[in-house]
Amino acid sequence: MGIEAIKEAGVVGAGGAGFPTHVKLNVKVEYFIVNAAECEPLIETDKFLCRQWPERIVSTVVKISEMLGSTKNVIALKDHYHREIQALEDAIQKLDAPVEVFKMSSFYPAGDEQSMIYEVTGRSVPERGLPSQVGCVVDNVGTVLSIADALEGKPVCEKYLSVTGDVKQPKMYHVPLGTPIRAILDAAGVQRGTYNVILGGPMMGKTVMSEEAIDNTVVTKTTGNLLVLPKDHYLFRRASYSIPKMIHQARSACIQCKMCTDLCPRHLIGHDVKPNLVMRSVWREEQIEDNDEYIKYFGSAANCCSCGACEMFSCPMGLSPRKMNDYVKG
């Protein structure tokens, strides 16, 4: 009954991936983990939801745990989210719910599903595997509230999102799906022609870099934030680099320091991810005919989660290992 209601309501992952929730919940696991870490900077949506509806979140976690048969139910968020932690802990105590709050250190990408599973359980999801393989299901806190609505017969037809960045007053908006982002930007007082937008956060968000593109973009089930920045911002300049230019930069400037590999979150939980090897040979990727040699240099790119830590933090030369991994993955 519950799974079917979630399917009929059209619930998908609200945290960005958009995976059908009824499929994800159709398993039996030990852990149910609610992702409230708000992985990227300059996003406020998940924190807002935790403050506004802590009891609804906690009570729905209990209902979901009954579907999953989970014995350990965890809401994971960063340890400096003091107001959100207090609200959730008060709700857990009031409802006497079998749920605990897991306080994570403030690191990026704390909200990455597999990094979170490792932090909470100590288990590493197999490369290109699913959390259920290690007895876990992870859902975003926004997804949990969509499930709460679904169990009451309400389909997913609205979305909470934050508007942040270079705006006079960052705000939360509650809008119908399909709302043009232009209408939201106008409501936020954003002057036309002077700003571009990132759907999501500065690390993994999708850039919208023309007035026409802004006019043609609407709110979907996975839209969680509109990050407004000046058109000449570094993030937009970087996003405009062509693949040939980035390949040329990799060939000429990569010093093979391995920092992109050593600081890769997936590498740190034991996955085979070696962006330094991709950077070393991406210029000749189309020339490699031997399958074993190709796998040696480029096979690990399939394990990249595209978090961007390598190009925004790790690389001392300002190169783009993440983009090169994405290019190799096709």
Identify the residue ranges that each predicted region occupies.
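Short acidic beta-strand-loop surface patches of small beta-rich interaction domains
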Residues: 78-82, 195-220
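Active-site loop ensemble at the mouth of alpha/beta enzyme cores that anchors a bound cofactor
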Residues: 108-138, 210-242
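Short, glycine-/Ser/Thr-/acidic-enriched flexible segments
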Residues: 19, 38-39, 108, 168, ...
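Iron-sulfur-cluster electron-transfer modules
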Residues: 1-96, 102-119, 248, 291-330
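Short, hydrophobic/aliphatic alpha-helical segments
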Residues: 1-10, 162-167, 240-244
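Ferredoxin-type iron-sulfur electron-transfer modules in oxidoreductases and energy-metabolism complexes
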Residues: 229-251, 261, 267-330
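Hydrophobic alpha-helical positions that pack around
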Residues: 71-74, 79-181, 187-192, 199-201
